[in-house]
Amino acid sequence: RICYIAPYDHKTCAAGENICYLKAWCDAWCSSRGKKLEFGCAATCPTVKPGVDISCCDTDNCNPHPKL
């Protein structure tokens, strides 16, 4: 699997990591900078805390930056 790890960078995931994910959450600067984003690979869709949005997918490069 190939997943984004930053808005313009992607990588080949480790063996067994077949899920791409994109986490989004607000911090103190959310109103001016927007949500913080975390991209990556995982074996399963990560569990998140309340207030954190996550989307998981299982095709190459399926976790792009939402505004690009």
UniProtKB/Swiss-Prot annotation:
<dbReference type="Pfam" id="PF21947">
    <property type="entry name" value="Toxin_cobra-type"/>
</dbReference>
<feature type="disulfide bond">
    <location>
        <begin position="13"/>
        <end position="41"/>
    </location>
</feature>
<keyword id="KW-0800">Toxin</keyword>
<keyword id="KW-1015">Disulfide bond</keyword>
<comment type="similarity">
    <text>Belongs to the three-finger toxin family. Long-chain subfamily. Type II alpha-neurotoxin sub-subfamily.</text>
</comment>
<feature type="disulfide bond">
    <location>
        <begin position="57"/>
        <end position="62"/>
    </location>
</feature>
<dbReference type="InterPro" id="IPR045860">
    <property type="entry name" value="Snake_toxin-like_sf"/>
</dbReference>
<keyword id="KW-0629">Postsynaptic neurotoxin</keyword>
<keyword id="KW-0008">Acetylcholine receptor inhibiting toxin</keyword>
<keyword id="KW-0528">Neurotoxin</keyword>
<feature type="disulfide bond">
    <location>
        <begin position="3"/>
        <end position="20"/>
    </location>
</feature>
<dbReference type="InterPro" id="IPR018354">
    <property type="entry name" value="Snake_toxin_con_site"/>
</dbReference>
<feature type="disulfide bond">
    <location>
        <begin position="45"/>
        <end position="56"/>
    </location>
</feature>
<dbReference type="GO" id="GO:0090729">
    <property type="term" value="F:toxin activity"/>
</dbReference>
<keyword id="KW-0964">Secreted</keyword>
<dbReference type="GO" id="GO:0005576">
    <property type="term" value="C:extracellular region"/>
</dbReference>
<feature type="disulfide bond">
    <location>
        <begin position="26"/>
        <end position="30"/>
    </location>
</feature>
<dbReference type="GO" id="GO:0030550">
    <property type="term" value="F:acetylcholine receptor inhibitor activity"/>
</dbReference>
<dbReference type="InterPro" id="IPR054131">
    <property type="entry name" value="Toxin_cobra-type"/>
</dbReference>
<protein>
    <recommendedName>
        <fullName>Long neurotoxin 1</fullName>
    </recommendedName>
</protein>
<dbReference type="GO" id="GO:0099106">
    <property type="term" value="F:ion channel regulator activity"/>
</dbReference>
<dbReference type="InterPro" id="IPR003571">
    <property type="entry name" value="Snake_3FTx"/>
</dbReference>
<keyword id="KW-0872">Ion channel impairing toxin</keyword>
<comment type="function">
    <text>Binds with high affinity to muscular (alpha-1/CHRNA1) and neuronal (alpha-7/CHRNA7) nicotinic acetylcholine receptor (nAChR) and inhibits acetylcholine from binding to the receptor, thereby impairing neuromuscular and neuronal transmission.</text>
</comment>
